[in-house]
């Protein structure tokens, strides 16, 4: 109630239920700075389609500073059509999370891979059969190259 706008998900506006919700948000909102386990997607946009490549990199670096500025680091995702942005997000300069995905949601993990969080989230990468690789500062990454936007583990937002 401090300036965000609910884009979808208002079935129970007065109840204590959490329906899937998509909302615009600002980095300074308390809820954005806290770890939330709910079907809520906060959208913090960045950049401009008309930006030059140099401006685009500066905008992405600013977005990554916001992204990595929170104390949690379990799972993250970027939605982009630009391979350069996806590669930056997955690189050592990009997402500081145990799981980093491109064009797919943040829930779920590749169980065979090392998974877990960074910073104040999770217990490192001690889970999964490849957990030893966590000591190599490696992240589990998923890139969706299709134009469909599937959610992990078959989750569906039926907002119709």
Predicted regions: what they are:
Residues 1-12, 28:
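Conserved small-domain helix->loop->beta segment predominantly found in fold-type I
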Residues 13, 17-160:
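Conserved C-terminal structural/oligomerization subdomain of aldehyde/semialdehyde dehydrogenase
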């Amino acid at each position: 109630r401090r300036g965000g706008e609910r884009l979808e998900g208002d079935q129970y506006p007065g109840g204590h239920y959490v329906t899937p919700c998509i909302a615009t948000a600002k980095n300074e909102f308390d809820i954005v700075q806290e770890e939330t386990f709910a079907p809520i997607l906060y959208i913090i946009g960045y950049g401009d389609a008309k930006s030059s490549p140099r401006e685009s990199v500066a905008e992405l670096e600013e977005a990554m500073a916001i992204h990595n500025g929170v104390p949690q680091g379990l799972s993250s995702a970027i939605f982009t059509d630009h391979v350069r942005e996806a590669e930056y997000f997955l690189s050592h300069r990009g997402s500081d999370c145990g799981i980093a995905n491109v064009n797919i949601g943040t829930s779920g993990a590749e169980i065979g891979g090392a998974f877990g969080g960074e910073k104040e989230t999770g217990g490192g990468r001690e889970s999964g059969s490849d957990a030893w690789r966590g000591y190599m500062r490696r992240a589990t990454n998923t890139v969706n190259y299709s134009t469909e936007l599937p959610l992990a583990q078959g989750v569906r937002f039926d907002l119709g």
